[in-house]
Amino acid sequence: YAELKAILAKQIPEKQAXIN
């Protein structure tokens, strides 16, 4: 799901922190 994570990170950079 690395691709999805990258897409979400681009769409929602703020959520990236949360995802990680």
Curated annotation (Swiss-Prot):
On the 2D-gel the determined pI of this protein is: 7.1, its MW is: 46.4 kDa. This is Unknown protein NF003 from 2D-PAGE.
